[in-house]
Every structure is written in C-alpha cells, then in structure tokens.
C-alpha cells in the first residue's frame, strides 16, 4: 500500500480519561502511526501533563471535561455520561472542522466504549465510528448476556453457578462485582456499551485470537469484532516498533532508578511483585494488613506498589519488620512493564485488571490473583482455570483474605511442582502473545486488514 495513501488516512482517538483506558489505546495509536497512518489523540486538558508523546507521527488536541458551575454533579452515571457526551460532541465538531480546514480530514473516530452512543455520535459528526473495548471478550460476553436479562449482577440469592455461551461455567465468585458508590446505575451503563454496536464500522478488543478463541468467535457472531492485542509496547513483544518501551502515560511519578537497582541485587525468579492497579482500590485496613503480613510470611522478597492515599493503612509493626528483615520494598508507583520483565521477578500478585493481566501473560509471569471489583473476578477465573497461569487467594468468611492463605498461594506459585507448571504455562502464553503481534501474526494481520479497508473506503 502506498505510503502517501496511508498518510492521508486520518484516525482520531477519543480515550476515556483513566490510565487503564488510555494506555492500550495509546499502544494501538502508536502501532497505526508506525504503519503510516496519520494519528491524532484527543486528550483531556487536565491530564495532558501526564502524557509523554514523542512520536512525531502522533498529533494531540485537547478538550476540557470541566463541568460548568450550573451543571452540578449529575445524580446518575447515565446523566453524568450524557453531559460528557454533549460536551465532547460539541468540541469534537470544532476539532473535526479544524482538521478539515488544515487539509487533514478525519476518516475514523476510535472512541472508548464507555462513552454512551459513541457510534451515533460519530455518524452525526459525519465520520465513521469504532468503539474500543478495554476489557476481555469473555467479560464482554458476560456484560452483554446480563444486558439481555440472562443473568443478574449482582447475582440473585442462592445462585451458585452460571452457564453462558462460549464461557466456562462461572461460579458466583467469578462474576463481575459492581461497587456502585456514587453511581447506583453503574452496571446499567456498562451494559449500555453494547447498545449501538450493530451500527459500528469497526469494533476493537485488546485481546488475541488464541487467548480467547471461543469467546471472540461468539462475539463475532453478534458483531464484527477485531482482536488487535496484546497492546503493550512493541519492545516487549514483536520488537517491530523501534524504541517503543513504555505506554507514554503515567498518572503517578515512578522512581524508576531505585526500583530497578533494588531488583538488580536479587536472584533470578526470587521476587514477588504486588500491585493493585492505578485506581484507588479502597481495600479495608484489615484486608491491607493481611496482605502485608502474608507477603512478609511468605519469606520471599517483594516489591509492593502502595499509592500514597493507601499507605496509612500499613501498620508500623509491619513496616518495622519488613525493614528489619530487608525483605520488601514499598513504593508509591513503579514502571510495571520494566518490573514484570525483570529477571528477578518470580510472580505477580495482582487485582487482575485486564491491562495487568495482559501484561503479565505477555511477559510470561505467573500470578497470585486477588480480584476486587468490576471485571477482575472473571479475569481471575481465566487466569486460574482456563489459562492455568496462576492461583487465586481464597476469601475468608468476613470478606477478607487471611495472611496464611496469602503466604501459601505465593509459595505455590514460586516453588514446587505447581510453580513449575504455572511458569511453563506462562511461558507458553508469552510465546503466543509475541506470535500474535509479529509480522503476519493474527493481530498484526487483523490490523493490516482494517487499514486496507479503511484506506479504500
């Protein structure tokens, strides 16, 4: 395909302003820019300072998501997202006109699936539209079946298991957990991600065919989805994109030097990396305390990411003993990909967010699963029972993990026959992840086919 035709094809990305949503979309944008397309990413003005976009082929525009004083705080997720949609639509219209005037008309808007009526919005603006999903195909199938009324979330009393098309039998504890908090209709909004997919020009999922073969096939029987993952920096996978070593976005400042220096001094496969994601996870004091002592009682070295707002939950006794035994390094943030790919890392204790799951799987790191909410329990089900690359810490009667169980699960992953089997499986999936993104791999071919259709349309 001629480079000139590619460079005249313009894709604009509209991410949802959260790190877990922006990172995979940024990776997709970088890959398309490397393949020759013109790319513009629309950033919320409030977070532009967190972005590190050095690729000259990626352009940025800013819009503000500020609410006017008269807006107040909408009473529901639907009302909130409705206001966001109105503001985004109005400002996108101006941005699209600006691009046309400058000689770079936009051919396609790739929009985070959380925005309501995304495809309708794109078509109203006279541009093709493609929702971008940041969860797995399996979770997409669960949410969609719930939208159809085939199951309820939270599940009804007495329900012990659920059977759904393409999905392994799910126990009650494998279903998504929605802690609604401010927005009691949050789950309804998640279901509404599927409201206009029949009108979409493309639908993108951050997964790959061999990872979710049956689940992707089932979703494809409903809509024309495209698997384009795993979306992590190329230097950790296929190495096609020169110097693509990070996601280019960090909402928190990481002390890279001290993390890597500490890991460099440890033996290969001897360290547990623990992190529960980029969003405040609201673990109770008792829960944090049990995790902390479980890490210490495992007798393995550990590096634990505890964001500043959660650090006060760590007891002085734990901190003193961890320092005395020189077993742990507690940091407010760290470069996760660099850490997971470090030779000293033997396992990853994770909340099972989809990005973290994909990163660990792609780097061949077995997991200790501690799912908290949203799609995480379903991801943990796949980590343990489907891909067989981790163990799940059981929850006690009070809804809190116990330190002994935490320590035992760490030992299961780090040593013995179970650990050997999990590491072997993790390395197998690492190879398949690389294969998907290599030239001619399943996701690489899917991306090339998408580009060809877009350019010729």
Swiss-Prot record:
Q: Which GO terms describe its biological process?
A: saponin biosynthetic process; terpene biosynthetic process; terpenoid biosynthetic process
MF (Gene Ontology): quercetin 3-O-glucosyltransferase activity; quercetin 7-O-glucosyltransferase activity; UDP-glycosyltransferase activity
Reactions it catalyzes: (20S)-protopanaxadiol + UDP-alpha-D-glucose = (20S)-ginsenoside Rh2 + UDP + H(+)
Q: Which InterPro entries match?
A: UDP_glucos_trans
Q: What is its EC number?
A: 2.4.1.-
Q: In which pathway does it act?
A: Secondary metabolite biosynthesis; terpenoid biosynthesis
Q: Which residues form the active site?
A: 21, 112
Gene3D superfamilies annotated for this entry?
A: Glycogen Phosphorylase B
Report the enzyme's class at the first EC level: transferase
Keywords of the record, alphabetical order, are:
Isoprene biosynthesis, Transferase
Binding residue positions for UDP-alpha-D-glucose: 134, 336, 351, 354-356, 359, 375-376
Please tell me where an anthocyanidin binds in this chain. 21
Q: According to the lineage, what is the superkingdom?
A: Eukaryota
Pfam families cross-referenced by the UniProt entry: UDPGT
Reported function = Component of the triterpene saponins (e.g. PPD-type ginsenosides) biosynthetic pathway. Glycosyltransferase that catalyzes the biosynthesis of ginsenoside Rh2 from protopanaxadiol (PPD).
What is the similarity comment for this entry?
A: Belongs to the UDP-glycosyltransferase family.
Q: Per its record, how is this protein called by name?
A: UDP-glucosyltransferase 45
